[in-house]
């Protein structure tokens, strides 16, 4: 038992070191290649520290969060093919972000940086609330009822996003498309810290309960 624990710990440390290496390499690649020697220059250091590094770290965080959500869904449905979008939660997030992009709203200056993040969370919470109400109303249906509800919500949100894409202008459509493709172009240290404060505790609790 102790031997297995030590082996798992070594594997974990090895993967962690490889991940750190990939983060450093990823942050140095791009249209402007940045070496460790060039970091002595303030201009290169600013690009590496304030533009590239937040994007790479956010990509790592999002990857971990999606993997955690996938594990939860697979455990919930007892199906290794289940994914985070199965219940329509991600579609609800995309729909609310689309609404925020196509029909801009006035927010206080302090919240402008987090606008899309706020709308995405609101959209996901709305879908979660709808699914919860459906499960309470039709509890006898079990997981099949939840699955069918998720398929219906996915279809409705997809249709609504299609309508938003039709009424939006070229710039709005491009912005929505980039967001749905997982663009990290707007990643900054403040948004990374907010995302980490939500995602990291969820991943830790999930690992602890596993």
PLM feature segments, named:
Residues 1-210:
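Alpha-helical transmembrane segments in inner-membrane proteins
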